[in-house]
Curated annotation (Swiss-Prot):
Phosphate binds at R86, G124, T125, R126. The gene is rph. This is Ribonuclease PH. Belongs to the RNase PH family. The keyword Hydrolase does not apply.
Amino acid sequence: MRPSGRTAQQLRPLTFTRHYTKYAEGAVLVEFGETRVLCTATVEEGVPRFLKGQNKGWITAEYSMLPRSTHQRHARESVKGKQGGRTLEIQRLIARALRAAVDLTKLGEFTIKLDCDVLQADGGTRTAAITGACVALQDALQKMRVEGKLKSNPMKGLVAAVSVGVVGGESICDLEYIEDAIAETDMNVVMIEEGAGRKIIEIQGTAEGAPFSHQQLLELLALADDGIKTIFQAQKKVLEK
């Protein structure tokens, strides 16, 4: 039995609050159980130097955790004077995931910056950030269309992510912190919805306590696929409002 009483494949309660702040073109508070991440999308004219003159857009991301988003306070990275390796890894993952879902040639020479700020961390912050950033990005793109900056929606499909892992020899989906801390295997899976199916954008998997078998890998991917299918349904529902 999991600490929350969930079954192996069961997600934590998932909610999206759109337009959470009023200034950004897209602003979404995403909540996976007790994990809460504020995701905003900002549209700026112009692109990085390496894309100038190509009539292509760009998507980038930044990720941070508030000092008391965790059990013990940690100093802001801005005070330390540099970003940590974990932060850089996560924000690059977020950016890669969302770029894979957008036809940058249809974006024009605009840059969309996704800011993902963890308000409270209870496991799965990077997967929550990707999932929430996708909804914020959709809102920003819709606003660009309304303002006449885009002729069509460049989004190829929804993007979502979920954590899976092996805890006590059992494969489970959507790990909370207490599970993640003792997991023998920890994996993050990012997918895009294409038609009625789903395709993998990225997999990050590590044997934390013990190596995992090929069979366990297949079990984890199946759990992730099923969980992300449910997340896509939740994204669609909130975007219809």
